[in-house]
Amino acid sequence: MLFSGVYNYSTDALLWDDFLAGNQVAYACMYERYAKVLYNYGYKIAQNRQLTEDCLQDLFLSILETRNRLGRTDSIKFYLMRSLRRELVRRLQAESRFDADPDAIEFRVEFHYEPTWLDAQVSADQSAALLRELDVLPPRQKEALFLKYFDNLTYEEIAGVMGIEQSSAYKVIYKAIAALQKRVDTGVLLLLLMVAKDH
């Protein structure tokens, strides 16, 4: 990590406030903290490395250039994910990669079986079955589960990132979990979601 010790911001609010005040170290720290997460999320939407990198670079340049007009936020990750998603959707629409409906995004996240401590808790067959079921969920449900359990966003933040109402975020995640519960052992599902929360 490039910025530790004195530049190790304890909260996003403090980091954002320093960035808004023009602190270049805060800007660099913010980039270091969130660029990889943003790239991974953006790539799942765009499936294009160059486009994802371009949008990510443009996003960080844009917030630097417009920081005097930006408001406060308690969650930089949420703010940046929402902004990146909007820009990717705009550019993909311009390229006619999907129609004008942002819900048409094919959110591509594949869940792969990798031996972990989860194997000590459940059989390899159960783990593999659950991961196969995750792979066949509709893209919107996969994205919502990914944001909730792998990126640890709140329902309000998920709604903001995906451009939906908070009640819709609850429903999408509920439907995804309900679909999984019908096809896999509930205990295995709970273990996976607990593992995801820790990452």
Task: Give the positions of each predicted feature.
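C-terminal edge and immediately downstream basic/flexible tail or linker adjoining helix-turn-helix-like DNA-binding
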Residues: 2-7, 160, 178-199
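Amphipathic alpha-helical segment used for protein-protein interaction
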Residues: 21, 113-143, 153
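DNA-recognition helix of helix-turn-helix
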Residues: 85, 89, 141, 156, ...
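Arg/Lys-rich amphipathic alpha helix in sigma70-family domain 2
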Residues: 65-72, 82-102, 123
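Internal acidic/polar
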Residues: 8-9, 90, 98-123
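N-terminal module of bacterial RNA polymerase sigma factors
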Residues: 1-37, 63, 199
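Structural recognition of an alpha-helix C-terminal capping motif at a helix-to-coil junction
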Residues: 40, 54-61, 74-86
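A short pre-motif secondary-structure segment
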Residues: 144-148
